[in-house]
Amino acid sequence: VFMLVSHRARGESAREVGWRLDNFFEAARLLLPPMLIVTMLLVGVGWYEGTLDFGRWEGGQTIMGVPGLSLIWGVLQQYALQGFINRRAQVALGRGALSVLLVASLFALFHLPNPWLTFATFAGGLLWAWVYQRAPNILAVGLSHSLMTWVMISSVPPGAFHNLRVGFKYFG
């Protein structure tokens, strides 16, 4: 609710925030090469470790009941990260490296104390913030987030990301 009130107070339209389709393919074009490279690396790790399983989800659960929720969750996280935080970072620091670094750092901080997930979200945050600043499209970066999460979970050993736990749940 706070973000919606903030958008209204600043006079930001849904289109300006990134809820649009006219630049979806431009955003996808920017996202696709790094996504393919990371996917090949992660699938290679999964193949080498013998942990490759595209049906696996957190804690060994099947992914079959999760896709819709995962897609929504990725889009919502990217709305908060890009549509709100990135836009405010650009106001404070300008478009470019400093605001991209701030956005990626904040995204990583939200995933502490999980070390590998913090690293992965920093790397993903760099890509998504950079792409959003060039082609602001929440749906494209949100779908990318969801797909890369699925690839990561399906490829690396199940315990590597501690079942995606963050905060105090990481220790439980």
Model-predicted segments: where are they?
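Membrane-interface helix/loop boundary segments of multi-pass membrane proteins
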Residues: 79-102, 130-137
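Hydrophobic alpha-helical transmembrane segments
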Residues: 28-32, 63-67, 97-102, 118-122, ...
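Juxtamembrane helix-loop-helix connectors linking adjacent transmembrane helices
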Residues: 11-76, 86-87, 91-92, 162-172
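Alpha-helical transmembrane segments in multi-pass membrane proteins
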Residues: 1-10, 30
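Functionally important transmembrane alpha-helices
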Residues: 118-172
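Membrane-embedded alpha-helical segments of multi-pass membrane proteins
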Residues: 1, 63-68, 76, 80, ...
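Hydrophobic, membrane-inserted alpha-helices
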Residues: 100-109, 124-128
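Aromatic-anchored segments of alpha-helical transmembrane domains
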Residues: 38-48, 104-113, 146-156
